Amino acid sequence: MQITEALISEPGDIRRFIQQAVDHWPHLLAFYFTLHSAEGNINGQQIHAFCTSFYRQVHERITERNHTASPSSPVVLRWLREQHRGATIRCLLLFSQELFCHPRASVTVDEECSQVVDLLQQSWQVISAGGQCRVEKRFQVARGDTSGQYVALKTVALSLGLPVVTAIIYRPVQRCTLITAQ
């Protein structure tokens, strides 16, 4: 798994990060949520462990589904979160809707989104005993949509306290070497 992080403090950079996600995925799902710690300030190690744990759970779930149903694209998660180290941190998680809601699956978007919320909450409970992960809003944005959900998503992203940390988490493609007998 590879994590690429950047600290950004300009509203234009935040808009660009959101636009890149919308441009990358034809159907984007985003979750705006708040992490609360009952143990005091949330530190960088806890956030890293949370993101890693969530990614692993998603990857395992998708790998399992790929064996029983239609394959999905590689797991890529984009995160946007406040940098400050308080007991509460607001976050955005962005990913392809097809990652969870495969067009040929019989499960609805609402059912799959409910499972995403459960995974977020379970991941945070492991990291912060007694803490809470409260999902505030879900966004569904189609590529080319410049109103409604897209505007609401950008507004929420821009409401995060500056500077913010962006992260992209993915598993690099493993290259295979073909060896031929001489």
Language-model segments: residues:
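Alpha-helix initiation/capping motif
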Residues: 7, 43-47, 96
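Catalytic "initiation/cleavage/transfer" segments centered on a nucleophilic residue
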Residues: 1-25, 97-182
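Generic structural signal for short, solvent-exposed loop/turn connectors between secondary structure elements
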Residues: 1, 38-41, 83-87, 130
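Signature for HUH/AEP ssDNA processing cores
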Residues: 18-81
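Histidine-centered divalent-metal-coordination microenvironment in nucleic-acid enzymes
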Residues: 75-101
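Surface-exposed beta-strand edges and their flanking turn/coil or helix-capping segments
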Residues: 45-48, 92-93, 104-106
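A structural signal for short, well-ordered beta-strand segments and their strand-loop junctions
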Residues: 32, 88, 133-135
